[in-house]
From Swiss-Prot:
UniProt organism field: Flavobacterium psychrophilum (strain ATCC 49511 / DSM 21280 / CIP 103535 / JIP02/86)
Keyword match Cytoplasm: yes
One Pfam family from the record: Tyr_Deacylase
Gene: dtd
Stated name of the protein: D-aminoacyl-tRNA deacylase
Residues annotated as transmembrane: none
Amino acid sequence: MKVVIQRVSQASVTIDSKIVAKIQKGLLILVGIEDSDNQEDINWLSSKIINLRIFEDKNEVMNLSVKDINGEIIVVSQFTLQALTKKGNRPSYIKASKPEIAIPLYQSFVSQLETELGKKVQTGIFGADMKVSLINDGPVTIIIDSKNKE
């Protein structure tokens, strides 16, 4: 499971000209799921994200987590994070899970984030053509791959 985490001052997801998710200060998380992902990946990754200290404290040191600041989260599925670009110029998405595998894992990931954050997590709609808007705060953008634990 690969994620791109962006610290935002606000973010939203629009589908067919309708805003389906919107947050203020918090995290926008893009998630790409592969066939070998499982609950262990979800548990490790959600704990890492919730406890990641990327928000500034009163001394302007990145020492606070999204939970510490009572921040919000939007999660957006993005199979293109699993792109393979080694051969040629057209990315291959063969590593990306098919919806029948990815959707339950995606839902479990969102549910685990909600449990650890202690509140509802906003989401896009899996597989939809989404317009994602954000104001990146910092900018702070972090990429994590659960397979490498980094």
